[in-house]
């Protein structure tokens, strides 16, 4: 699905709202909606190969789409132990921030870092939007929430102000996200599922 497909749906669904003639503003709102879905659901899990040397302990993921560093694996697919306790003695690495980590005992070799990826920045109507079709309604509700958030004097047929319409669309968005979670779209990021990705089955 392309940005233009969503633009067409937006202009149809919100025909009674004074939308900007220029698509740029709407594309920015579409991107915010896609980003929110990526934040709520694990729509893109990627890996980056890290070359380790003994004289360097601090490493940073270089890929531009890193949203959140998740875990670290050796070349056999074994998950390294993360320190989640202050002053812990037994640990392989500690997370510094969303894209950096420190190794306890760095050795020559390769490690594989798994991370949650951000969506591509949408700039053009021809750009592809990588979300399941089942999430389109949720995306449109988020767009409706954002559109009505910017409307200060709009009054709908039933008398609601723009702010009330905004709240209504956001509640619909949350409800649809809960439905998607119940349908199995929110896959937990546990060690077993991540190790399968590392070994190349996904």
What does each of the following model-derived ranges do?
Residues 22-29, 54:
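Short, conserved alpha-helical segments within structured domains
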Residues 12-24, 36, 40:
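Subunit-assembly interface segments of extracellular/virion macromolecular structures
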Residues 79-88:
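Short amphipathic beta-strand/extended segments with alternating polar/hydrophobic composition
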Residues 47-61:
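Solvent-exposed, conformationally flexible loop/turn segments
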Residues 1-9, 28, 32-35, 90-202:
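Internal mixed-charge
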Residues 62-79:
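Solvent-exposed beta-hairpin/edge-strand motifs
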Residues 32-49:
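Generic amphipathic, hydrophobic interface segment in small proteins and small subunits
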């Amino acid at each position: 699905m392309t940005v233009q497909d969503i633009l067409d749906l937006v202009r149809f669904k919100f025909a009674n709202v004074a939308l900007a003639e220029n698509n740029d503003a709407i594309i920015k709102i579409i991107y915010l909606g896609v980003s929110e879905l990526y934040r709520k659901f694990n729509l893109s899990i990627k890996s980056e190969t890290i070359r380790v040397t003994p004289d360097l302990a601090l490493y940073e993921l270089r890929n531009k789409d890193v949203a959140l560093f998740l875990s670290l694996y050796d070349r056999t697919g074994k998950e390294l132990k993360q320190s989640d306790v202050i002053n812990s003695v037994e640990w392989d690495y500690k997370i510094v921030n969303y894209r950096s980590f420190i190794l306890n005992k760095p050795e020559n070799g390769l490690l594989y870092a798994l991370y949650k990826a951000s969506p591509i920045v949408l700039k053009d109507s021809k750009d592809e939007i990588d979300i399941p079709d089942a999430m389109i309604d949720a995306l449109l509700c988020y767009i409706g929430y954002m559109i009505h958030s910017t409307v200060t004097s709009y009054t709908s047929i039933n008398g609601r102000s723009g702010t009330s319409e905004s709240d209504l669309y956001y509640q619909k968005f949350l409800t649809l996200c809960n439905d998607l979670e119940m349908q199995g779209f929110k896959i937990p990021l546990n060690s077993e599922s991540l190790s399968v990705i590392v070994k190349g089955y996904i």
